[in-house]
Amino acid sequence: MVNMKASMFLTFAGLVLLFVVCYASESEEKEFPKEMLSSIFAVDNDFKQEERDCAGYMRECKEKLCCSGYVCSSRWKWCVLPAPWRR
């Protein structure tokens, strides 16, 4: 019985210690997730889409016309694939 109490106490103490370490590292590095996400999703100038006269799939079509093969959704104002119910 004593052995089980000791193991439960050690488990609980380990969880508390893990929580304290995680909280301390999070409070030190609050900007780390933002920096990591911005570096992952950073877009290089070579990979940027070129500006077109028409809007492609799932692009806004308020001011631009949709490219061939797409229609402007009256509800969402996006360029979508034409379907029988969108006539």
From Swiss-Prot:
InterPro entries: Huwentoxin-1 (IPR011696), Huwentoxin_CS1 (IPR013140)
MF GO annotations: ion channel inhibitor activity; sodium channel regulator activity; toxin activity
Signal peptide stretch: 1-24
Gene deletion effect: The natural mutant mHwTx-III does not reversibly paralyze cockroaches.
Disulfide bridge map: 54-67, 61-72, 66-79
Tissue spec. comment: Expressed by the venom gland.
Keywords, alphabetical: Cleavage on pair of basic residues, Disulfide bond, Ion channel impairing toxin, Knottin, Neurotoxin, Secreted, Signal, Toxin, Voltage-gated sodium channel impairing toxin
UniProt organism field: Cyriopagopus schmidti (Chinese bird spider)
Domain of life: Eukaryota
Miscellaneous field: Negative results: does not inhibit sodium channels of adult rat DRG neurons. Neither HwTx-III, nor mHwTx-III agglutinate erythrocytes.
Protein name as annotated: Mu-theraphotoxin-Hs1a
Example of a GO cellular component annotation carried by this entry: extracellular region
